[in-house]
Amino acid sequence: MKVTDVRLRKIQTDGRMKALVSITLDEAFVIHDLRVIEGNSGLFVAMPSKRTPDGEFRDIAHPINSDMRQEIQDAVMKVYDETDEVVPDKNATSEDSEEA
């Protein structure tokens, strides 16, 4: 399985989230709402998640092996590094990261 497309929108915010991302796998399956987060050790790609009733976050979709996780990380960060446009936080929603 290969990452065949990355749609990324950098956002301007005071928080740790730096971009919203959608990826396409094998030109056949899209995953929305990945995020680029600034962590203590640098930028990383966080999988889409939702908050449970007890306040914890659980991934909705995620790779099950380290090779796929690394491929997603590499593909997203390549596009992140190549993207100059940043939108204000008020415009950064999940809908903005969907394909037009």
From Swiss-Prot:
Coiled coil: none
InterPro entries from the UniProt entry: SpoVG (IPR007170), SpoVG_sf (IPR036751)
Keyword set includes Metal-binding: no
SS bonds (residue pairs): none
Cell cycle found in the keyword field: yes
Keywords: Cell cycle, Cell division, Septation
Pfam families attached to this UniProt entry: SpoVG
Gene3D superfamilies linked: Stage V sporulation protein G
GO BP terms: division septum assembly; sporulation resulting in formation of a cellular spore
HAMAP family named in the record: SpoVG
Additional facts recorded: Expressed more highly under biofilm conditions after 24 hours of growth.
PANTHER family: SEPTATION PROTEIN SPOVG-RELATED
Role of this protein: Could be involved in septation.
Protein family according to the UniProt entry: Belongs to the SpoVG family.
Stated name of the protein: Putative septation protein SpoVG
Gene: spoVG
